[in-house]
């Protein structure tokens, strides 16, 4: 069997290290430019106003979409494919800003104490499929749920109040009866507040 020689000279290693460092610096510059755009789009808003717009969704997405359409050359320069790609960066900057200013309480499913039939109800809702993060954050006395989902190389964030998180979830509304939806919402709120305390 032929062995492949994987040894490199000092010059080759130095060149590869320099190329790697250059790529890291280019990505840092790219992210800094995107962060500047985030500040330009949402910087004049308070965190609570940003939170309201994020939950409302339409006005949040409209700002992002309008900026993308008006700055297509810049988007291409930043290797942004489409509005969704651009929006994912804006969403991540906002979530990071929330985390930097408020305490995120991890909702640990190990604290979930339910009979099997209720666990099946939660699974039937499909709300937590592809979940990679679930937190409770309290802003000005109101409890919110921050839901992170990942799949196919994309990360999405959804936020709603602890009271509305389940009842407004499209998957839960589609997959559960009205009575089951109410039961699920009550159980989830109890679980979330238990994790908080």
Regions flagged by a language model, labelled:
Residues 2-9:
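Acidic, low-complexity intrinsically disordered segments
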Residues 12, 25-27, 32, 47, ...:
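Intrinsically disordered, low-complexity regions enriched in serine, threonine, proline
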Residues 153-197:
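Ampiphathic alpha-helical segments that act as solvent-exposed interaction surfaces
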């Amino acid at each position: 069997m032929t062995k492949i020689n994987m040894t490199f000279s000092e010059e080759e290693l130095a060149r590869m290290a320099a190329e790697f460092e250059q790529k890291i610096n280019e990505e840092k510059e790219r992210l800094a430019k995107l962060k500047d755009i985030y500040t330009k789009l949402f910087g004049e808003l308070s965190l609570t106003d940003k939170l309201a717009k994020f939950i409302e969704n339409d006005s949040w997405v409209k700002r992002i979409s309008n900026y993308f359409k008006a700055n297509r050359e810049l988007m291409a320069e930043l290797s942004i494919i489409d509005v969704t790609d651009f929006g994912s960066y804006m969403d991540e900057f906002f979530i990071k800003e929330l985390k930097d200013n408020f305490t995120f309480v991890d909702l640990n499913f190990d604290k979930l104490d339910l009979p099997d039939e209720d666990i099946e109800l939660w699974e039937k809702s499909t709300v937590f499929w592809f979940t990679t993060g679930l937190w409770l954050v309290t802003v000005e006395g109101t409890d919110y749920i921050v839901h992170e989902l990942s799949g196919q190389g994309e990360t999405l964030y959804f936020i709603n109040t602890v009271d509305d998180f389940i009842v407004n979830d499209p998957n839960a509304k589609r997959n559960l009866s009205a009575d089951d939806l109410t039961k699920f919402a009550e159980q989830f709120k109890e679980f979330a507040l238990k994790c908080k305390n």
